[in-house]
Amino acid sequence: MSGPELGRLIDEVDRTVDVQFAAAGDLDELNRLYASLLGRRGSLNALMKQLPGAAPEERKALGQRLNAVKGRVERAREEATARIKRAARDRELSAPPLDITLPGRWRAPGRPHPIMRTLDEIVDIFVGLGFDVAEGPQIELARYNFDLLGFPADHPAMDMHDTFYMAGDPGQNVLLRTHTSPVQVREMLSHPPPVMIVAPGVVYRRDDDASHSPMFVQIEGLVVDRDVSLADLKGLLEVYSRRMFGEATRTRFRPSYFPFTEPSAELDVSCLVCFGENRACPQCKGTGWLEVLGCGMVHPTVLRNVGIDPEEYTGLAFGIGVDRTANMKFAVDDIRAFYENDVRFLGSL
């Protein structure tokens, strides 16, 4: 491009700089204008690339003119930026004042999770019956979780596919507790009879389906004293069932097996949904009964393991799945829904 032609284009840009920057109404528009002039593809940079095409004796003067225009662009940008910010501040100051006394946006108040509400209700029932509440660690030793409770070495619960063992422990001595029975063991080791406790807490098992969760809440109970009998166990759990599920609740005990109790039983209550009158009931599968808990008389071997003479003392024990109890009370099909943090679901319970 010839020197005169390049000079004419420089003058055209120079004449419009002040007008264009004065017309910019906001910072976005200002930045776009600046980029159109001095950006990588801006018009002034494009003219700078044309300098080598001018005559040698014209290049110095043309370069000085280009640099002068660039300086004007920078100054115009600074002035326009200050003007736009000043105008924005003036608009903000002239706006109606904010009334800080107006109420904010309403938020629904928080409340306990359905699982914890159920647990609190169960604990309150047993505390009202004279039980103390005991707690223990969630990371437990196999000695307390299995050995002292009379689990045989080949019991399925001790397998890797049923229990979460801690990494880096080749001896499988440290684990996430599979029940709160270790709390009972620790309590019997540290306190001589009589013992009358409930042990609520989170437990872990390798199980995940519609009726099981790998992490769930359990509460176990223990009574050790002289002359504790199966009749005491039956009467205690019948009182619990009526207070938890209603005075009209019927109960039945079925023989079962647990390594740490003998005899052992499962307690069922009459269906809370169909009351045994609907063969198609999804809650009880048409049986009219719902499994609530496992229970039994403390095995003499367990008492010996913790230093209690089974000839002098007897004990009763029971374990309640709080998640399953909540599942029954709220008629929820999939127990995993309690842990999916769907606020709409949790708020409906």
Curated annotation (Swiss-Prot):
Enzyme class at the top of the EC tree: ligase
Name the record gives this protein: Phenylalanine--tRNA ligase alpha subunit
Keywords carried by this UniProt record: Aminoacyl-tRNA synthetase, ATP-binding, Cytoplasm, Ligase, Magnesium, Metal-binding, Nucleotide-binding, Protein biosynthesis
GO cellular component, one term: cytoplasm
Subunit text: Tetramer of two alpha and two beta subunits.
EC number: 6.1.1.20
Cofactor, how bound (note): Binds 2 magnesium ions per tetramer.
Pfam families: Phe_tRNA-synt_N, tRNA-synt_2d
SUPFAM superfamilies, A to Z: Class II aaRS and biotin synthetases, tRNA-binding arm
Compartments in which it is found: Cytoplasm
Family: Belongs to the class-II aminoacyl-tRNA synthetase family. Phe-tRNA synthetase alpha subunit type 1 subfamily.
Encoding gene per record: pheS
